[in-house]
From Swiss-Prot:
<protein>
    <recommendedName>
        <fullName>Multifunctional tryptophan biosynthesis protein</fullName>
        <ecNumber>4.1.3.27</ecNumber>
        <ecNumber>4.1.1.48</ecNumber>
        <ecNumber>5.3.1.24</ecNumber>
    </recommendedName>
</protein>
<dbReference type="GO" id="GO:0005829">
    <property type="term" value="C:cytosol"/>
</dbReference>
<dbReference type="Pfam" id="PF00218">
    <property type="entry name" value="IGPS"/>
</dbReference>
<feature type="binding site">
    <location>
        <begin position="154"/>
        <end position="155"/>
    </location>
    <ligand>
        <name>L-glutamine</name>
    </ligand>
</feature>
<feature type="compositionally biased region" description="Polar residues">
    <location>
        <begin position="232"/>
        <end position="242"/>
    </location>
</feature>
<feature type="region of interest" description="Indole-3-glycerol phosphate synthase">
    <location>
        <begin position="255"/>
        <end position="519"/>
    </location>
</feature>
<keyword id="KW-0210">Decarboxylase</keyword>
<dbReference type="GO" id="GO:0004049">
    <property type="term" value="F:anthranilate synthase activity"/>
</dbReference>
<feature type="active site" description="Nucleophile; for GATase activity">
    <location>
        <position position="104"/>
    </location>
</feature>
<dbReference type="InterPro" id="IPR001468">
    <property type="entry name" value="Indole-3-GlycerolPSynthase_CS"/>
</dbReference>
<dbReference type="GO" id="GO:0004640">
    <property type="term" value="F:phosphoribosylanthranilate isomerase activity"/>
</dbReference>
<feature type="binding site">
    <location>
        <begin position="76"/>
        <end position="78"/>
    </location>
    <ligand>
        <name>L-glutamine</name>
    </ligand>
</feature>
<feature type="region of interest" description="N-(5'-phosphoribosyl)anthranilate isomerase">
    <location>
        <begin position="535"/>
        <end position="770"/>
    </location>
</feature>
<keyword id="KW-0315">Glutamine amidotransferase</keyword>
<dbReference type="Pfam" id="PF00117">
    <property type="entry name" value="GATase"/>
</dbReference>
<dbReference type="InterPro" id="IPR011060">
    <property type="entry name" value="RibuloseP-bd_barrel"/>
</dbReference>
<dbReference type="InterPro" id="IPR029062">
    <property type="entry name" value="Class_I_gatase-like"/>
</dbReference>
Amino acid sequence: MADSGLVDHSPHHPTKAAQLSTASNVILIDNYDSFTWNVYQYLVLEGATVNVFRNDQITLEELIAKKPTQLVISPGPGHPETDAGISSAAIQYFSGKIPIFGVCMGQQCIITCFGGKVDVTGEILHGKTSPLKHDGKGAYEGLPGSLAVTRYHSLAGTHATIPDCLEVSSSVQLADDSNKDVIMGVRHKKLAVEGVQFHPESILTEYGRIMFRNFLKLTAGTWEGNGKHFGEQSSTTKATVPSNPPPKTDKKLSILERIYDHRRAAVAVQKTIPSQRPADLQAAYDLNLAPPQIPFPARLRQSPYPLSLMAEIKRASPSKGMIAENACAPAQARQYAKAGASVISVLTEPEWFKGSIDDLRAVRQSLEGMTNRPAILRKEFVFDEYQILEARLAGADTVLLIVKMLSVELLTRLYHYSRSLGMEPLVEVNTPEEMKIAVDLGAEVIGVNNRDLTSFEVDLGTTSRLMDQVPSSTIVCALSGISGPKDVEAYKKEGVKAILVGEALMRAADTATFIAELLGGSSQTVSSESRRSPLVKICGTRSEEAARAAIEAGADLIGIIMVQGRTGCVPDDVALPISQVVRSTPKPASQALHTSQEPPAATSVEYFDHSAKILRHPSRALLVGVFQNQPLDYILSQQQKLGLDVVQLHGSEPLEWAKLIPVPVIRKFGLDEPAIARRAYHSLPLLDSGVGGTGELLDQSRVQNVLDKDCGLRVILAGGLDPTNVAGIVQKLGESGRKVVGVDVSSGVESDGAQDLNKIRAFVQAVRGL
């Protein structure tokens, strides 16, 4: 090899330092790079005891359990956010606890973990030796102000995104005569966390072994704990700092940039956690575990108001601070849905907006079983397919894509990925240039943010100014700053189809009234159907005569007991004629349903309200078969054989059976049992004591407590009811009595152990008077 002026700085005949008791358990994370073992060699030569683990072969929990004295992150190929395995999560956890040193990709992981960005430098280097200028602190303590280092990289941290908590400790100049430099070292200002982009373990790097020696002297997780005071440059070190300091290092980032950087770091860490890795999410999606979804654009076109409402769950914001810290996201969602919202926007950003993906998951669960439920939007700073897949698995129907924060290439990629999961995104714009990008993209729904995300200033005229750029088929939504009816008047005239409201809704004393006033409706627009007398169920029916008398009196449900050994159990040869009577006997004309006051189709109806309606047949009574702890196959067989319209489960059957039985299910609950108000399983819960049929009255105060726990709960009340007490018991419940949508009687209409037709008629008449 010709003499090139290169100097071999490797320890040809190394002298191993004495064993360091303070570096007795150094953990070295191997990012699948051959240089890892050069790093290992230098650490061992300096007296450290080192254990090496590949980045995908140890979990964070296992790493924590090993109680390392220092942590070193090795070089490696690829990008720190996708190829560093456990590295970023380890940095996040151990920062401030133990000293951390990163080499090459290890430094890049440090930068991204604290909110910075890594990007191409314009150079692709492999074994390039460059002159380094440094600040003489940390790893560089005691070294000459300029020294030769060896570089193997094409990526590096970017000056404009280095967060305030980090300082640039060294740099090299680009070789293109641009007088610009590349970040070669960063250091946390308070925590004992330092990184280098070059390779101190290379044989062509000067003083590499001393750099590792300086690191191994550290024993505490902070500089102060190690007797160092970094973060401010002293007069003695200023001369060694690069002569052309990066002009953007101290640039104040916009709120959007700060949030974006923080989310990038957080998502990078999350993607390394077992059970939350991209492959884990994809596996769950491939198992069809994502909740059912609805088409976002179609739901936006349905509203009981002149404009559709996108109602937002928002605990805080960067501009207003804390808004509703203690808000319960699922409870808020139900209020919005019943008030006529077409979409519920759930902010899932945790630091500035105090939301989470768990909020979205809970919101989706809270709307389960509602008719025409609102679509669910994940309001988040999305920059990765991972976040879109995570949203779909949590139950989102759409996601937000912000044009301002995405390159056209990335925006296009994310848009099409979201659509591949069945979610048409909401594409957010703020300027004419951004609107053109969204229109060219083919977005079906475009949201115009009246708030400039750089300055966070609000201009309600922003939406109006951009309307002429939008095709007529595109749904335009006005976002941000809307607080009252005057704010939306112009939008109605200009073709805006929807508005998003967050803070004003979260602060509203009466959500439904505020929404109606805001959108020009009335409190009656989304009110449920008018009050009806409760459903009447006559149980323990044992003859055709009793069934016919009950129906002609106006009963809605005729129950027959299918439980062998129970009083009143009827065999099949008795049950079949009763079934025929139920199907052939019409209800009295006075019991015909009136539908004129039912809620508009565009609204969402609570699950139990819908279920109660299903159990109220317009022209005849329904036959209910009562079962108790019997095999599912037997229940299904009897349902088909007898033509049961409804199945009642009166024992300890699994809740999930309600979804396996092809007709509505009434399920008996005691007052202390859980899941009484669980939606989308049993059609209605029946409150009763013991096994039923005992004639024992339920404790009124306890019934009231059960009803008051959930405003959407509807029940059938049983237990000791008879013609003389049923009206008084329901009336005594006061306003909570409106949640009693059915009453059930068995022994209360019997005399001497047999059904009494006069008592049946009297019971029905007493209920109809409510």
